Regions:
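Active-site groove signature of glycoside hydrolases
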Residues: 130-158, 279-285
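Secreted/periplasmic carbohydrate-active enzymes, especially glycoside hydrolases
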Residues: 1-106, 127-130, 136, 143-146, ...
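Short acidic, glycine/proline-rich loop/turn micro-motifs
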Residues: 58, 117-119, 247-252
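Substrate-binding clefts and catalytic carboxylate motifs of secreted carbohydrate-active enzymes
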Residues: 145-147, 161, 167-172, 179-180, ...
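Short, solvent-exposed turn/loop segments enriched in Gly/Ser/Thr/Pro and often Arg
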Residues: 27-32, 50-54, 86-95, 109-114, ...
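Flexible, glycine- and charge-enriched loops at secondary-structure boundaries
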Residues: 62, 66, 120-124, 156, ...
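Alpha-helical scaffolding within the catalytic cores
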Residues: 32-36, 91-96, 118, 123-136, ...
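Active-site cleft segment of glycoside hydrolase catalytic domains centered on the general acid/base Glu
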Residues: 117-124, 148-174, 183
Length: 334
């Protein structure tokens, strides 16, 4: 029996020598792309995902235990997910293993993001070492299908050289899994979006972050946007969304209300349905999390409020919008 999100079958595998014995639970599956499709065990799948930070479910702190992982992933399961993006760094091993047991495919990444020192050799060695450590630890986790090498990195020649080396390093260590990165979109003319990044040639999927309706216009802009892509690869939106304070209500046009976030997700879902070759999404983010960059008093209070679940575990209205779409997708891919 091959491992799938619907039937996450694991086998006990024992290895022994004269001096040592190792036992592990391992699943078996295949993963590949074919044109704009992602194929798991030669069957097309849609990655119904969500992004997750390594934070405890009901209070501020670093998640580290199996119980923490199970709670976070149970929310993702209720949302209708079969996939999680563990951002923006390798999460603890309990999270990856619990995701495997519960039937979640995984995008795992290293913290190469924004504007780092691309031409610094020590910076590259740091990134490569984290990449090697991540792959060495989780190479036998069948649910990990994407190694991500970057997040929101502005275009430049030094950046491309840096990430090219990382992509090549991934494939030298693991030539089976998919290589991704969270690139950035571009509005080539009013209402027409694409990804125009030479890094995309090195990746197995066209993966990118976009915040149409939040950092880019209002929610109604989603109604006017169309997407075009030249490459025949699966399209994957690694981040989308907007913020809301749980319990804050008002007009659908008033930012940080649950109604604005709900409306944004409704319009976003309709926009996503128009994207050619879309094979997966991981909206930002499952749960509100601490962020010292977020200072709006009585709303943010040093929290990023883009979660579909509050920092206290309360589900916002947008949670149920995404849940409804994911349930529809689950039925359509049966």
């Amino acid at each position: 029996v091959l491992w799938t999100p619907e039937e996450p079958k694991l086998y006990v595998v024992n290895l022994s020598s004269e001096t040592d014995k190792v036992s592990d639970e391992i699943g078996f599956r295949t993963i590949r792309t074919e044109g704009t499709k992602i194929l798991l065990n030669d069957e097309e799948i849609f990655c119904r995902g969500i992004s997750i930070h390594e934070e405890t479910p009901y209070y501020s702190g670093r998640a580290y235990s199996r119980d923490h992982a199970r709670t976070l992933l149970s929310w993702a399961k209720e949302l209708g997910c079969n996939f999680v993006r563990l951002a923006h760094y390798p999460h603890n091993e309990e999270m990856v293993r619990e995701a495997e047991r519960m039937g979640f495919l995984v995008w795992s990444e290293i913290p190469v993001y924004w504007t780092i020192h691309w031409e610094n050799k020590d910076t590259y060695q740091n990134a490569e070492q984290q990449l090697c450590d991540m792959i060495a630890r989780d190479k036998n986790r069948c649910n990990v299908i994407i190694w991500s090498i970057a997040n929101e990195t502005p275009l430049s020649e030094p950046r491309l050289a840096f990430l090219t080396k990382l992509a090549n390093k991934v494939r030298s260590l693991d030539n089976v899994r998919l290589v991704g990165a969270a690139m950035e979109k571009e509005e080539v003319r009013p209402g027409v979006m694409t990804v125009n990044d030479p890094l995309g040639e090195l990746l197995d999927i066209i993966s990118f972050n976009e915040y149409v309706g939040w950092y880019d216009g209002d929610s109604e802009k989603c109604d006017r946007v169309n997407w075009v892509f030249d490459a025949r690869k699966p399209v994957f939106i690694s981040e989308l969304g907007g913020g809301a304070l749980y319990g804050r209500h008002g007009s659908r046009k008033e930012r940080f209300t649950e109604e604005y976030q709900e409306d944004l997700y409704i319009r976003h879902v309709n926009m996503l349905k128009r994207i050619p070759g879309l094979a997966g999404t991981t909206p930002w983010i499952l749960k509100d999390f601490r962020s010292p960059r977020r200072h709006v008093p009585e709303i943010q209070d040093d929290f990023n409020r883009k979660g579909l679940v509050s920092d206290k575990g309360q589900k916002k209205k947008a949670f149920f919008v995404l849940q409804k779409w994911y349930r529809e997708l689950e039925e359509s891919y049966k």
